[in-house]
Amino acid sequence: MEIDDCNRGGPREMEQDMTTAQYFLPLATYPDSSSGLIISNAVAFAGHYGAHLHACALTVAIPHIPNAWSSLLLDTPKMIEHAETLSRDRAATLVSAATNLAASAEVELSCRTVKTTLPLLHDTAATEARFFDLAILECIADVPDTRIVAEAVIFGSGRPAIIFPNKTLVGLIDHLVVAWDGSRAAARAVNDAKPFIHKAKRVSVLSLTGEKPLPETSGAHLAEILVSSGINASATVARFTSSSIGQSIQQTALELGADMLVMGGFGHSRLRDFVLGGATDGVLENPMLPVLMSH
């Protein structure tokens, strides 16, 4: 793995201290490229919370494994060279876009390029994310690789991640909805979301009934604890009615006026394929609003 570091801060020099959050933004370059939307959303999000954004462009190295038949039919070395050049060019474009947006928004930005082999691309994203407080990700339905990267980071980094939908998000994140079922993963998500919960103007603790048995007062108890911490929190119970628990949670959160959803991520790796819980799968299949997910 090769690393190229480049620091590109905005015009504002911020004195770094222990309270400055560090956000990680992986930028894919091959076979698909990260979108410009995730860069603009990441810059806006980091700016809102006064965080230092670290963009990491992942370029690929494709090993050439000689094969007699393929050598006769294809110019494999030339194809590899083209793919690697495309990856490098996309990395330069993404880094330039991040630099310009961060400078305009006066957000502190560090950029680096990490070169890795194509099969290890997703694992590399997860490994890089371990150094930071939070990962910022995108999931686009017709770009499967974005979901693969998201799954790798969520379940392999040990860090919380925020998944953004593929649309421009404008405005402050003032109303947080916590999807609460009393589970370990949900508790972990609430703890990881504390910086956002404490800054929010309002927090709604949402429990959906009808999908699995839930303690009747669990959500209300969490809301009480949050209130005792000085947070404007309340509990809400809704009925699960749609075919997808993940979509039902998101739709209910939007109906409540949520700017961001907080939830636990359920899943485990089986032979390098992730077996996901229903809510997690539904959110990654079609994120409808920013979702902080923690595993």
What are the residue ranges of the model-derived segments?
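Small/aliphatic-rich secondary-structure junction motif
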Residues: 4-80, 156-159, 168, 172-238, ...
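Short beta->alpha connector loops
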Residues: 115-119, 141-143, 183-184
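A short acidic, glycine-rich active-site loop
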Residues: 77-93
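Gly/Ser-rich helix-loop-strand patches that form or flank binding pockets
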Residues: 2-12, 39, 44, 48, ...
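Acidic/glycine-enriched edge-of-secondary-structure segments
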Residues: 109-111, 145, 149-152, 174-180
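Structural beta-alpha unit
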Residues: 2-18, 60-61, 96-135, 229-261, ...
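Amphipathic coiled-coil/heptad-repeat helices and related helical stalk/stem segments
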Residues: 35-38, 121, 146, 186-189, ...
